[in-house]
A protein has these predicted regions:
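Jelly-roll (double-stranded beta-helix
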Residues: 1-190
């Protein structure tokens, strides 16, 4: 399984049997490939403050790989009025160079999947073109609201879309933030 954690508020402690004990905070993204197997836990780093986060599990396209952990900072200024790719497929172009994630592509997972984050001014129009034919899209509104084909998506709304090549969104409020996940719709185990 490919497990992606995105803190929205506060921070989490990640601990696993591979020796990782890390704090992942708002403004960072954590990726773990469970591969051949790993025991792990995530919990709130603060005894008194609330933590909010997304944890997304994606079926991998390869089995029995060596488990791995990666954590990168997000350049939130780079996602202003544009979609910033934060996750792409392995061994995607420039996905890793000298063991470090390539700034433009974020980090990677064992799947033909793409994760994009963006924060938009009110009225800003966004076009997302699918990277791979046959993939589907899941939209998740983190903050604010977006319009899609006359439908309003509010904070914490999600929507799955299939059989399309392009989607067009419009930010309905100032500071509207969205996560766009593009994943295969069919089993693609190698």
């Amino acid at each position: 399984m490919e497990i992606i954690s995105i803190p929205l508020k506060g921070s989490l402690v990640h601990q696993d049997n591979l020796g990782h004990k890390k704090v992942v905070s708002e403004g960072e993204i954590q990726v773990m490939s469970t591969g051949k197997g790993v025991f792990h836990s995530e919990y709130n780093n603060s005894p008194s403050e609330t933590a909010e986060f997304l944890q997304i599990w994606v079926f991998p396209n390869q089995l029995n790989v060596t488990p791995r952990y990666d954590q990168i900072p997000l350049d939130q200024s780079a996602e202003h009025n544009t979609l910033q790719q934060v996750i792409g497929p392995f061994p995607g172009p420039k996905a890793v160079h000298d063991g470090k994630p390539h700034k433009e592509n974020g980090t990677w997972i064992y799947q033909d999947a793409y994760f994009h984050l963006g924060t938009f001014d009110a009225g800003r129009e966004i076009q997302y073109d699918l990277k791979k034919q046959g993939n589907g899209i899941y939209l998740f509104v983190i903050d604010g609201a977006f319009l899609l084909d006359g439908h309003r998506l509010e904070k914490r709304d999600g929507l799955g879309i299939v059989d399309t090549e392009t989607i067009n969104l419009k930010a309905a409020e100032q500071g509207s933030r969205i996560l766009i996940i593009e994943v295969p719709m069919k089993n693609n185990l190698q």
